[in-house]
Amino acid sequence: MERLSEQTCEICRVGAPLATAEEIAGFRSQIPDWQILTIDGVQRLSRTYRFRNFAEALEFTNRVGALAETEGHHPAIVTAWGEVTVQWWTHKIKGLHRNDLIMAAKTDALLE
Protein backbone atom coordinates (compact mmCIF):
# COMPACT_ATOMS: atom_id res chain seq x y z
CA MET A 1 0.00 0.00 0.00
CA GLU A 2 1.24 3.46 -0.87
CA ARG A 3 2.52 5.45 2.12
CA LEU A 4 0.41 8.55 2.72
CA SER A 5 3.36 10.50 4.12
CA GLU A 6 5.16 10.18 0.77
CA GLN A 7 2.27 11.55 -1.29
CA THR A 8 1.65 15.14 -2.34
CA CYS A 9 -1.63 16.99 -1.97
CA GLU A 10 -3.54 17.69 -5.15
CA ILE A 11 -5.41 20.88 -5.87
CA CYS A 12 -8.91 20.42 -4.50
CA ARG A 13 -11.81 22.25 -6.10
CA VAL A 14 -15.43 22.72 -5.09
CA GLY A 15 -17.25 19.57 -6.10
CA ALA A 16 -14.23 17.27 -5.65
CA PRO A 17 -15.25 13.89 -4.24
CA LEU A 18 -15.16 13.27 -0.52
CA ALA A 19 -12.92 10.45 0.68
CA THR A 20 -15.00 7.28 0.75
CA ALA A 21 -15.47 5.22 3.89
CA GLU A 22 -13.49 2.46 2.18
CA GLU A 23 -10.61 4.82 1.34
CA ILE A 24 -10.49 6.13 4.91
CA ALA A 25 -10.62 2.60 6.35
CA GLY A 26 -7.87 1.47 4.00
CA PHE A 27 -5.47 4.11 5.29
CA ARG A 28 -6.41 4.05 9.01
CA SER A 29 -3.44 1.80 9.79
CA GLN A 30 -1.15 4.63 8.67
CA ILE A 31 -2.85 7.23 10.88
CA PRO A 32 -4.08 5.15 13.85
CA ASP A 33 -3.95 7.95 16.44
CA TRP A 34 -6.26 10.26 14.51
CA GLN A 35 -9.94 10.46 15.41
CA ILE A 36 -12.73 11.25 12.99
CA LEU A 37 -14.95 13.97 14.44
CA THR A 38 -18.10 15.49 13.01
CA ILE A 39 -18.52 19.17 13.79
CA ASP A 40 -21.47 21.08 12.33
CA GLY A 41 -22.09 18.14 10.02
CA VAL A 42 -18.53 18.19 8.64
CA GLN A 43 -16.16 15.27 9.18
CA ARG A 44 -12.58 16.11 10.13
CA LEU A 45 -9.49 14.31 11.35
CA SER A 46 -8.28 15.36 14.80
CA ARG A 47 -5.27 14.50 16.93
CA THR A 48 -3.80 15.99 20.09
CA TYR A 49 -0.03 15.75 20.50
CA ARG A 50 1.58 16.01 23.96
CA PHE A 51 4.82 17.86 24.75
CA ARG A 52 6.92 18.57 27.82
CA ASN A 53 6.33 22.33 27.75
CA PHE A 54 4.91 25.25 25.80
CA ALA A 55 8.11 25.90 23.84
CA GLU A 56 8.06 22.38 22.37
CA ALA A 57 4.36 22.70 21.55
CA LEU A 58 4.96 26.03 19.82
CA GLU A 59 7.90 24.66 17.84
CA PHE A 60 5.73 21.77 16.61
CA THR A 61 2.95 24.21 15.71
CA ASN A 62 5.40 26.17 13.56
CA ARG A 63 6.55 22.98 11.83
CA VAL A 64 2.94 22.05 11.05
CA GLY A 65 2.43 25.57 9.70
CA ALA A 66 5.47 25.29 7.44
CA LEU A 67 4.25 21.90 6.18
CA ALA A 68 0.81 23.38 5.47
CA GLU A 69 2.35 26.21 3.45
CA THR A 70 4.48 23.76 1.46
CA GLU A 71 1.49 21.55 0.61
CA GLY A 72 -1.02 24.39 0.17
CA HIS A 73 -3.46 22.76 2.60
CA HIS A 74 -4.07 24.30 6.02
CA PRO A 75 -5.40 22.83 9.30
CA ALA A 76 -7.02 24.23 12.39
CA ILE A 77 -4.36 24.25 15.13
CA VAL A 78 -4.83 24.89 18.84
CA THR A 79 -1.61 25.32 20.82
CA ALA A 80 -1.65 25.19 24.61
CA TRP A 81 0.87 24.44 27.34
CA GLY A 82 2.18 20.95 26.60
CA GLU A 83 -0.19 20.11 23.77
CA VAL A 84 -1.16 20.85 20.20
CA THR A 85 -4.44 19.79 18.62
CA VAL A 86 -4.43 19.58 14.83
CA GLN A 87 -7.56 19.14 12.73
CA TRP A 88 -7.57 18.45 8.99
CA TRP A 89 -10.58 18.72 6.68
CA THR A 90 -11.25 20.30 3.33
CA HIS A 91 -13.34 23.45 3.53
CA LYS A 92 -14.22 23.52 -0.17
CA ILE A 93 -16.01 20.18 -0.04
CA LYS A 94 -17.08 20.35 3.61
CA GLY A 95 -15.53 17.07 4.65
CA LEU A 96 -12.61 14.71 4.27
CA HIS A 97 -10.56 14.46 1.08
CA ARG A 98 -7.55 12.26 0.41
CA ASN A 99 -5.43 15.38 1.05
CA ASP A 100 -6.52 15.32 4.69
CA LEU A 101 -5.34 11.73 5.09
CA ILE A 102 -2.03 12.67 3.48
CA MET A 103 -1.58 15.67 5.76
CA ALA A 104 -2.42 13.68 8.90
CA ALA A 105 0.34 11.22 7.98
CA LYS A 106 2.77 14.02 7.16
CA THR A 107 1.96 15.71 10.48
CA ASP A 108 2.80 12.48 12.33
CA ALA A 109 6.03 12.21 10.33
CA LEU A 110 7.18 15.56 11.73
CA LEU A 111 7.84 13.76 15.03
CA GLU A 112 9.68 10.76 13.57
UniProtKB/Swiss-Prot annotation:
Transmembrane parts of this sequence: none
Signal sequence, start to end: none
UniProt-listed Enzyme Commission number(s): 4.2.1.96
InterPro entries in the cross-refs: PCD_sf (IPR036428), Pterin-4-alpha-carb_dehyd (IPR050376), Pterin_deHydtase (IPR001533)
Matches recorded under SUPFAM superfamilies: PCD-like (SSF55248)
A family per Pfam: Pterin_4a
Reactions listed under catalytic activity: (4aS,6R)-4a-hydroxy-L-erythro-5,6,7,8-tetrahydrobiopterin = (6R)-L-erythro-6,7-dihydrobiopterin + H2O
Family label: Belongs to the pterin-4-alpha-carbinolamine dehydratase family.
Alphabetized PANTHER family for the sequence: PTERIN-4-ALPHA-CARBINOLAMINE DEHYDRATASE-RELATED (PTHR42805:SF1)
Protein name: Putative pterin-4-alpha-carbinolamine dehydratase
